[in-house]
Amino acid sequence: MERLRQIASQATAASAAPARPAHPLDPLSTAEIKAATNTVKSYFAGKKISFNTVTLREPARKAYIQWKEQGGPLPPRLAYYVILEAGKPGVKEGLVDLASLSVIETRALETVQPILTVEDLCSTEEVIRNDPAVIEQCVLSGIPANEMHKVYCDPWTIGYDERWGTGKRLQQALVYYRSDEDDSQYSHPLDFCPIVDTEEKKVIFIDIPNRRRKVSKHKHANFYPKHMIEKVGAMRPEAPPINVTQPEGVSFKMTGNVMEWSNFKFHIGFNYREGIVLSDVSYNDHGNVRPIFHRISLSEMIVPYGSPEFPHQRKHALDIGEYGAGYMTNPLSLGCDCKGVIHYLDAHFSDRAGDPITVKNAVCIHEEDDGLLFKHSDFRDNFATSLVTRATKLVVSQIFTAANYEYCLYWVFMQDGAIRLDIRLTGILNTYILGDDEEAGPWGTRVYPNVNAHNHQHLFSLRIDPRIDGDGNSAAACDAKSSPYPLGSPENMYGNAFYSEKTTFKTVKDSLTNYESATGRSWDIFNPNKVNPYSGKPPSYKLVSTQCPPLLAKEGSLVAKRAPWASHSVNVVPYKDNRLYPSGDHVPQWSGDGVRGMREWIGDGSENIDNTDILFFHTFGITHFPAPEDFPLMPAEPITLMLRPRHFFTENPGLDIQPSYAMTTSEAKRAVHKETKDKTSRLAFEGSCCGK
């Protein structure tokens, strides 16, 4: 059999290799995906396999930098695959060399389960609708057996359930009822939960609560315009349009996936798991191209729910590791999801059969006005002396849907050298049925008759691979502190002294820190080998992030064990190429036991992280206590954080941006007439805008 595999692999290699993209970090093309899957099929000839993942195995950091900065060889083009083999436990994973079209690495992992794909989820609804035991439970809930086409489910990863462990590839089906296909099912949840074997496509068990609850008889809580007209009589009058125009075109330049904008240059990648990946981020500082970050992405997230009742403890989706921000990404619509002058990037994946599939317009790139960049006026001449510069920001965005929730991710580049991540949470609350005489509290809120929306958290892990002014970086916590010297002392005579206390992390254990609102804690990532000529301090990028709620699940709980990164706002570990995912490579149905992911990387906490290549992981998010205003469709809830330069430049890097208006004191004295660059703004109710 091994000889047959070798022959098949050699036959595949004899065919032409797919064209190689211009940049080694570019995602796999459809031709590369097909070539990779054909190679894997040939290698496993005679076996019944299906594909779960086919994606780029990014070049090693060192190899990439040698190619980019030192004239080294082009890194090999590799595809990473995960497959399932019928009748075999776990997965097989490996690498395909796309130049030789050969499998160069493969291994079997029998005690893990792979990420859930859209194909996996789409089959679940039909499985439960046709299962006799589910039909019986629907009838007991008050739904006629001939209305199973009105029963819907959100297929969730099961998280972990000790009854089955990792032996079967499972989903839990959260079940709902629609009286009409346009209804929102979330106002009519059912009280039982089928467990579905994804590969066998059958229900293997149904979790049934001790107390039974009939399906709600209340009208569905719907939200489309036709429903709102029925509710309130009419929609609001349509507001006059606010048009975004750029008659002279955009100011960014795209070369393949490489972006150049306002002195920034970086590569935009996209994969099945993290979605958008920003790599090789640099800044052209008046001719000196300075590296900032080697790679930035969202590496994991968890949404733990707060009801202690069985089986709600299983509701703690690690959406990035269990579904994939890439797999679940939306095709974006011009003028709706993104507004203005837009450039899109598509995303390419493999289906179970090994054929390429494309999500059109997966990534949106555009510019927006961002208000004032800076302004100063002089009161001495009645504010005639004035400098006003407006800001433009570059936004790289995607939106992905994880069952009921939408996650809108916006990577924002700013003209003062800062990089911001804005996340907007919207979509629909996950709901569970309330009996007529039941109270929701304290673990949830009654947001509609018979509807309980449970308390929950959204916690994200931001992975930062820094290269602040080159290799050899460090990290520190920065806290605002009052002077230790007492009022009236020579060092603090008037009692008003305060300062920034910077604590550099020497070891991994030092870095395990949490946000402190009392001290306005921020974190610096810096290069200790360089010095700002003015401040005498090392060039750094400061992480400013104040939305850092603690993980509320108890230490030792299933939630805490499966998210070993979420117990601290910051975890800094030594760099290794394979340290990508802080809950491990294969997250579904992991019990949280054992040493893997962040738990493995932290170890005993003694490793050095000062003046070396480091990985900086940041946990942030929100705690959500639902309210009726969040239902039936939730207004977008914002989360934001910023990476801003500190001691990186010698002055405000945005001063060379063309101002909107500039009048010096000497010009004001000579009564020089100047007009603003903006010729489109006008007064709302009369005339045109003034000259200033």
From Swiss-Prot:
Region Disordered: start and end of each range? 1-26
Tell me which residues are glycosylated: N243
Protein location: Peroxisome
Q: What is its EC number?
A: 1.4.3.21
Q: What induces it?
A: By methylamine.
**Matches recorded under InterPro entries:** Cu_Am_Ox_Cu-bd, Cu_Am_ox_TPQ-bd, Cu_amine_oxidase, Cu_amine_oxidase_C, Cu_amine_oxidase_C_sf, Cu_amine_oxidase_N-reg, Cu_amine_oxidase_N2, Cu_amine_oxidase_N3
Cysteines paired by S-S bonds: C338-C364
Question: Which residues does substrate bind?
Answer: 317-328, 402-407
**Location of 2',4',5'-topaquinone modifications:** Y405
Q: Which UniProt keywords apply?
A: Copper, Disulfide bond, Glycoprotein, Manganese, Metal-binding, Oxidoreductase, Peroxisome, TPQ
GO CC, any one term: peroxisome
In this chain, composition skew of type Low complexity spans 1-22
Q: Which residues bind Mn(2+)?
A: D465, D613, I614
Name the coenzymes or cofactors required. Cu cation; Zn(2+); L-topaquinone; Mn(2+)
Top-level class of the enzyme under EC nomenclature:
oxidoreductase
PTM per UniProt? Topaquinone (TPQ) is generated by copper-dependent autoxidation of a specific tyrosyl residue.
What domain of life?
A: Eukaryota
Give the record's family classification.
Answer: Belongs to the copper/topaquinone oxidase family.
Q: Which PANTHER family match?
A: COPPER AMINE OXIDASE (PTHR10638), COPPER AMINE OXIDASE 1-RELATED (PTHR10638:SF86)
State the name under which the record lists this protein.
Peroxisomal primary amine oxidase
Q: From which organism does this entry originate?
A: Pichia angusta
